[in-house]
């Protein structure tokens, strides 16, 4: 009976993770469709996402915790929100999401640089392959805007990796509190741009920003927070890869934006490298757990 209940929870968690990744993937197309400054978009998107997460926190009866383990990752998450939207405005949606998807590689690099963790052979191979993939993105569009967009997307990936390290083994209430801090950071940062750029207020952009805040950012983070409790790490990694695969597809279908050939090749290298590395790490963890149990 316990096994059946656990499997049901695990299956539900995997479904929630898949829904989460699918909803995350609609970011690129809606960011492209809103004719506003990127900082305005990230601010208002975070406002609606924050209200969504706050409502969930209240329903669940969670406390909002402000300490080092929520403020530091929250600040980094806020930078991710800001940089990701800016990257989507500066470069292609495919470049923006795939280059941000490099965050696990930055976790390895930061852990080695700042915490003295030693590289395993597979870590070294994954880092090299990922950076080869990243390099491919810079062979396609050499205009100043695209180059800047690529660097901003890589910065978002680095901040996301740093966020996961700073978050550590935070409890559920701390994870949701960090999300709120991140959304507050992005909103406060964008306030001056809302005032100075005076974005055109019309029905479609307002509808799109609400969709971005509630459906693309707020609800997926709630789903992710729920799924993380029961979804196996390997399944999370594989299902999470749905986002960078679907994101450019929606933009191609609804906006006609096509990534370049080298970007496509680089994207495949990055996604495969990160996913295979995550699978190998998950199998090692499962093997270690089995040895401890025996």
Identify the meaning behind each predicted range.
Residues 1-40, 75, 83, 142-169, ...:
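Glycine-/small-residue-enriched transmembrane alpha-helix faces in small-molecule transporters
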Residues 40, 47, 85-116, 156, ...:
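Specific alpha-helical transmembrane segments that line the substrate/conduction pathway
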Residues 56-60, 103-125, 245-265:
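C-terminal transmembrane-helix exit sites in multi-pass transporters
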Residues 60-95, 99-100, 132-136, 213-231:
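Specific transmembrane alpha-helical segments of multi-pass solute transporters/efflux pumps
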Residues 7, 46, 139, 241-294:
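C-terminal-most transmembrane helix of multi-pass membrane proteins
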Residues 96-102, 167-185, 217-253:
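Helix-helix packing/entry segments at the starts of transmembrane helices
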Residues 53, 75-77, 109-110, 119-139, ...:
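Hydrophobic transmembrane alpha-helices of multi-pass small-molecule transport proteins
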Residues 33-79, 106-107, 159-163, 180-197, ...:
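Transmembrane alpha-helices of multi-pass small-molecule transport proteins
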């Amino acid at each position: 009976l316990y096994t059946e209940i656990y499997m049901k929870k695990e299956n539900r968690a995997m479904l929630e993770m898949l829904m989460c990744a699918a909803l995350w993937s609609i970011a690129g197309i809606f960011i492209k469709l809103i004719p506003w400054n990127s900082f305005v978009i990230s601010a208002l998107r975070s406002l609606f996402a924050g209200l969504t997460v706050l409502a969930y926190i209240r329903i669940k009866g969670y406390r909002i915790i402000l300490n080092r383990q929520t403020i530091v990752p929250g600040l980094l998450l806020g930078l991710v929100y800001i940089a990701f939207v800016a990257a989507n405005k500066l470069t292609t949606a495919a470049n923006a999401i795939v280059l941000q998807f490099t965050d696990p590689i930055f976790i390895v690099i930061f852990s080695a640089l700042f915490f003295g963790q030693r590289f395993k052979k597979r870590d070294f191979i994954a880092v090299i392959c990922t950076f080869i993939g990243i390099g491919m993105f810079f062979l396609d569009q050499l205009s100043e805007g695209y180059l800047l967009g690529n660097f901003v997307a890589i910065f978002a990936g680095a901040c996301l990796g740093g966020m996961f390290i700073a978050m550590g083994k935070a409890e559920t209430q701390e994870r949701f509190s960090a999300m709120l801090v991140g959304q507050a950071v992005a909103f406060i940062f964008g306030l001056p741009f809302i005032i100075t750029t005076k974005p055109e207020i019309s029905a479609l952009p307002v509808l799109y920003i609400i969709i971005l805040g509630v459906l693309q950012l707020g609800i997926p983070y709630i789903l992710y927070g729920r799924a993380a409790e029961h979804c196996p790490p390997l399944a999370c990694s594989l299902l999470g890869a749905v986002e960078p695969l679907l994101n450019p597809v929606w933009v191609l279908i609804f906006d006609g934006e096509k990534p370049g050939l080298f970007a496509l090749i680089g994207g495949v290298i990055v996604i495969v490298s990160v996913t295979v590395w995550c699978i190998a790490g998950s199998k090692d963890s499962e093997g270690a757990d089995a040895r401890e149990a025996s």
